[in-house]
Structure formats: C-alpha cells, structure tokens
Swiss-Prot record:
Component of the auxin signaling transduction pathway that regulates cell proliferation and differentiation during flowers stigmas and styles development. Involved in the regulation of auxin-related genes. GO terms for cellular component: nucleus. InterPro entries: SCI-1-like. Disruption phenotype: Enlarged stigmas and styles due to increased in cell numbers. GO terms for biological process: auxin-activated signaling pathway; cell division; negative regulation of cell division; regulation of auxin mediated signaling pathway; stigma development; style development. Specifically expressed in flowers pistils, especially in stigmas and styles. Barely detected in roots, stems, leaves, sepals, petals and stamen. Residues 1-11, 24-48 have a biased composition (Basic and acidic residues). Residues 63-77 have a biased composition (Basic residues). It comes from Nicotiana tabacum (Common tobacco). It is found in: Nucleus. The lineage of its organism: Eukaryota, Viridiplantae, Streptophyta, Embryophyta, Tracheophyta. This is Style cell-cycle inhibitor 1-A.
Length: 154
C-alpha cells in the first residue's frame, strides 16, 4: 500500500491531452461565438430581403390600389340591414305600422288585410333600397295601431 503518490509523468498524462494553455481555450470559444453571431446576422439579412419586396410605380398606377375609406363605408351601409320579403309581414309589423303612420298618414287598424299586404309590399321595396330612416332598421318596439286615443289611467 505504500505509494499513493503519482509520479510527475503520470500527472501530466491525466491533466490535458493537448499542450495548449487556458488562454488558448478562451480565445477559441470567443471566436466561435463571433462566428455564430455573424452567421445569425447573415440569416436575418437574407430573411429581411425576402420579406420586403418593393413594388414598382407602374404596378401602383395600374389600378392595383387598396380600397379607400369611402369605399369601405359604402360597403358597410349596404350590409347594415337584412333584405325583406313579403313573408316578413308579421316579423316587421311594428316597423310597418310606424311607416304607415309617418309616410302614408294611415293607421294599421283602418286597413283591410288585402290593402295592408299591398302597402307592405311598398314598404319592403323602400326597406330593401335602404331609403328608410335608421330607426326602422334598428327596430321599433311598438307601433301606432289605431287613431283612437286610449285613456288608460295608472
């Protein structure tokens, strides 16, 4: 059990495989880091060039322009309401009764069912053209039904 000590030759064998100094290792690591950074920058530059393609002035003049705000506004006003048909007679009855009173000076209760249907078709035409006031498209809770002034006390 005598000798746990290693000879100087054995110590040299286990320390390092190459005879380089610790400063050489630091330098080589720094060089690798710099090389990596340069490669990353090159990749970024390439990707930027691919993403940012400029258009010539000829393409812009040829009519490939985006819609202006006024065009967008017109499109929204068209889709603001749903189109009606004669089948919507019962669902839009409050709006129809209000329209009768305001535009035709008639009350819904004074009309026969046939006359009311005919006038409703006129109402549908005005509705679909978008010529009615915004209150009609937003919805009306109750409409005027008769000319009688009800005197209900609370």
């Amino acid at each position: 059990m005598g000798s746990d000590k290693k000879t100087p030759e054995e110590k040299r064998k286990h320390k390092r495989s190459s005879p380089s100094s610790p400063l050489d290792e630091v330098k080589s690591k720094r060089q690798n880091i710099k090389g990596d950074e340069e490669r990353r920058k090159e990749k970024k530059d390439k990707s930027k060039k691919e993403k940012h393609k400029s258009h010539s002035s000829e393409e812009k003049k040829s009519g490939e322009k985006h819609k202006t705000k006024s065009h967008k506004h017109k499109d929204k006003s068209k889709n603001k309401f749903e189109e009606l048909s004669k089948d919507d007679y019962f669902s839009k009855n409050n709006e129809f009764a209000t329209w009768l009173k305001d535009k035709k000076n008639l009350f819904f209760s004074d009309l026969s069912s046939e006359t009311a249907r005919d006038l409703f078709s006129d109402f549908v035409i005005q509705w679909n053209k978008g010529k009615l006031d915004s209150q009609y498209y937003e919805g009306i809770a109750t409409g005027p039904r008769s000319s009688h002034a009800w005197n209900i006390k609370k």
